[in-house]
Design a protein with these regions (language model features):
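Extended, hydrophobic/aromatic-rich amphipathic alpha-helical segments that build helical scaffolds
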Residues: 300-315, 443-452, 466-475
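Secondary-structure transition into beta-strands, especially the periplasmic turns and strand N-termini
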Residues: 8, 141-142, 457-462
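Aromatic-residue-lined binding/catalytic grooves and analogous aromatic/hydrophobic interfacial grooves
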Residues: 20-420, 518, 534-605, 645, ...
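Well-ordered alpha-helical segments within folded domains of soluble proteins
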Residues: 353-366, 439-451, 516-526, 570-582, ...
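Loop/turn elements at helix/coil->beta-strand transitions in domains of secreted/extracellular proteins
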Residues: 370, 494-495, 625-628
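Non-catalytic carbohydrate-binding regions of carbohydrate-active enzymes
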Residues: 448-482, 539-565, 573, 584-704, ...
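Sec-dependent N-terminal signal peptides
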Residues: 4-15
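The feature captures the catalytic groove of carbohydrate-active enzymes
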Residues: 323-352, 401-465, 476-539, 714
Length: 719
């Protein structure tokens, strides 16, 4: 038995070593938070850098929303150990000192180490408990001082521009403030928390949108929310080994309940065991999938891996990873010199979840096999299902869930985007907004992700099925309802729904049968029927209109819609039937039509870019346009403008731009692996000169492992 186990271990060892990512190291100290390195786990992120000889850490925990729906940082931690760190900013002139300082992110186990000749500091976050550990190890006894620093020690007025960080945005009242935190210093710990007052932006939004009679039934994550933590480990003694612990808690309740939660977490800390299970989790995370390139593409796969690490830091959260910075925003003046605000600032809000952007953070997780990372985004919509159904019932008197594009974490449209100066009699269910009116189909992408999580990973999705059904029901009932507002019939002469007014993304407005919406309805319905219920959705499927085509300069292509009133943004929804809906593309009879759309549609060509949330690299890969896909994906995944390579942006949003990273991930994956009706296509858009080894996930619970080198497939394992 022992010998057999030994041989099995030897067989598994090469795969294990190949899967583990390389460390990422700096040997020159940074000088500000924009030159920070991320570290995290569970639902906590830290930006770590050195400044004036001290180690500084911004700490952010997912779900720490204030009364205005700003996503607050827990604060800043400063660690001073003995003598200041030796700086290497002049290392080019003094090569003998080049390695006196190092800061290393150990991706394989999620830890970070900062080292100088006299001591090292190791940082790690428990992936199962909201606890940060700071460990100092020195060659001789040293004093180590740790400080908690806050910028919220007074009521801070929030002006109109700074209010972009919260749900009020440009409609912020003149007296808007971020209320002060409570900070308590004791001999052996520091305790700090932000407690939301009784009235929050939730109450304002409910009143604004005519739902006061329903308020007690609506989900409210801001009510009585207390977020903060407790820092322990301070000592005046000089020691060779110091250990500091920062425990965080977010509780909707009283201060006593919040403290009980902190106490319980602290009692459950088992340092050695917690360190072991955290390292095991990260090791298993990297075993799930990988992409390793060398040569000219090595930078792309490295940055793919670094960004995937950042996503992994929010794996066990109650809240999705925000597209506009996730857990790793830094001082805003380094993103925009005109935004000299607090570290809590990020453009496009903290509790506002823009669906078109959020989806791009989550699509790549199916192919990477990170199904647990998908769950916070799925749960986000599930929690809001009742609120979305309430909107349909109160405003229009029919069923189904109406989710809007700029959606708050309590399920209603963002109050600024909803419109504060609305005409009398305007439909209260609609956003009075030229970009967002009638755009409510993005939730269907998350519905498809839910269904594919079962297809790919065997996830139990039973609790999410009412959400999927209700989202489809909304389109069936609402567009028949609108048709009857216009005339006697609720379907067209072919028995199809009339999706009007519709919206093809934010771009083609007042659209008639937009192709992006029709592709979404058809794909989600067919996937639902295949995975769950073959019979019950047949009638609805038959009512979905066909995707419209048009002829431009003699070439047939997908139309954005049958008709539209105006173009309002710069998206290309006519390619959504290619991605995310995979109805057109390689291995299908309609490939030429899709390629014509990509290559010759004048708007698609005009809007093409690799910036931010732009998806052209993905479409090029899905259409087998290898040179184009490689060029655009290389532009996506090349190192960003900040010191840490996977801090992209700000793009159209903020830094680090997570939908920039998400589109890069999807594009790289799609160049390596695609499927058509369950048939796997290997290297569909991969340059012959790029060497790669990868393991990715496919439908049916399959994994695909390939080594491609010097223009040949050296290994292919599908299991």
């Amino acid at each position: 038995m022992t010998r057999r186990f030994f041989y099995v271990l030897l067989l598994l060892l090469p795969l294990s070593l190949w899967a583990q990512p390389e460390d990422y190291t700096w040997d020159v100290a940074g000088s500000n938070s924009a030159e920070s390195m991320p570290c995290g786990g569970g639902d906590i992120g830290m930006n770590v850098w050195t400044e004036d000889g001290d180690i500084l850490m911004y700490v952010c925990r997912s779900g720490s929303f204030d009364e205005n729906n700003t996503l607050l940082k827990a604060g800043r931690i400063r660690l001073h150990v003995g003598e200041p760190y030796v700086y290497n900013t002049a290392s080019e002139n003094t090569p003998s000192e080049k390695h006196t300082y190092s800061q290393t992110l150990h991706l394989s186990d999620g830890t970070m180490t900062l080292s100088c000749p006299t001591h090292s500091v190791t940082l790690w976050v428990d992936v199962w408990k909201p606890v940060i550990h700071v460990e100092v190890n020195a060659t001789k006894a040293v004093h180590a001082q740790i400080f908690y620093e806050s910028w919220r020690d007074y009521d801070h007025p929030v002006g109109r521009q700074e209010a972009q960080q919260c749900s009020y945005k440009w409609t912020a009242p003149k007296d808007l403030v971020t209320h002060a935190d409570t900070i308590i210093r004791r001999d052996d710990f520091i305790e700090f928390y932000h407690q939301n007052p009784p009235a929050t932006v939730f109450d304002y939004t409910v009143m604004q949108q005519g739902l006061l009679s329903e308020a007690s039934h609506l989900y409210n994550p801001l009510k009585d929310l207390i977020s903060g933590g407790r820092l322990r480990g301070m000592t005046s003694k000089a020691l060779r080994h110091h250990h500091f612990q920062l425990t965080l808690a977010n509780v909707q309740g009283s201060r006593e309940e919040w403290r009980k939660t902190l106490d319980a977490t602290e009692r459950n800390v088992r340092l050695k065991a917690d360190r072991l299970v955290t390292r095991q989790w990260w090791a298993a995370f990297w075993q799930r999938s990988w992409i390793r390139c060398d040569g000219e593409a090595a930078e792309l796969s490295r940055n793919y891996t670094l960004f995937r690490y950042m996503l992994g830091c929010n794996a066990h959260s109650a809240w999705p990873t925000k597209f506009n910075g996730g857990l790793f925003t830094f001082d805003p003046r380094y993103v925009d010199s005109q935004s000299d605000f607090s570290p809590d600032y990020r453009r496009w809000g903290g509790g506002t979840h823009t669906a078109q952007n959020q989806r791009l953070v989550y699509w790549p997780l199916l192919v990477s096999g990170d199904y647990d990372l998908l769950q916070p985004q799925f749960d986000f919509y599930l929690r809001l299902l009742s609120t979305a159904e309430t909107r349909s019932r109160v405003y229009w008197g029919h069923g189904g869930a109406c989710f809007t594009e700029q959606i708050e974490n309590f399920g209603l449209p963002n109050p600024a985007e909803y419109g504060s100066k609305r005409p009398d009699g305007f439909d209260p269910g609609l956003e009075y907004n030229a970009w967002l009116e009638y755009e409510w189909d993005t939730v269907l992408e998350f519905c498809q992700m839910i269904l594919l999580s079962k297809t790919y990973g065997g996830m139990d999705i039973s609790k999410y099925l009412p959400l999927v059904r209700s989202c489809l029901q909304f389109f069936d009932e609402h567009y028949r309802y609108l048709a009857l507002q216009r005339g006697r019939k609720n379907l067209d002469e072919d028995g199809h729904l009339v999706i009007y007014p519709g919206s093809a993304c934010e771009t083609y407005k007042m659209a008639y049968n937009p192709s992006s919406t029709l592709a979404a309805l058809r794909t989600v319905t067919e996937t639902y029927m295949h995975e769950v219920d073959t019979i019950g959705m047949i009638g609805f499927l038959q009512r979905i209109p066909p995707i419209p085509h048009r002829i431009v300069d003699g070439k047939e292509m997908i139309a954005p819609a049958m008709a539209w009133e105006r173009i309002n943004n710069e998206e290309s929804p006519q390619l959504y039937p290619v991605f995310p809906w995979r109805l057109y593309g390689l291995g299908r009879d309609n490939l030429e039509i899709a390629r014509n759309t990509y290559l010759y549609d004048p708007d698609v060509v005009r809007f093409r870019s690799s910036k931010g949330w732009k998806q052209d690299n993905i479409w090029a890969a899905c259409l087998g346009l290898t040179e184009e896909a490689a060029r655009l994906t290389a532009e996506k995944l090349k190192s960003g403008p900040y010191r840490f390579p996977a801090f992209w942006g700000p793009g159209f949003d903020w830094s680090p731009d997570h939908n920039w990273g998400g589109t890069g991930m999807i594009g790289l994956q799609s160049m390596l692996l695609q499927e058509v009706d369950g048939e796997i296509i290997i290297l569909p858009a991969w340059p012959k000169s790029w060497n790669v080894s990868f393991k990715l996930h496919a439908s049916g619970g399959r994994t695909v492992e390939v080594e491609y080198r010097d223009g040949e497939v050296k290994k292919k394992i599908i299991q």
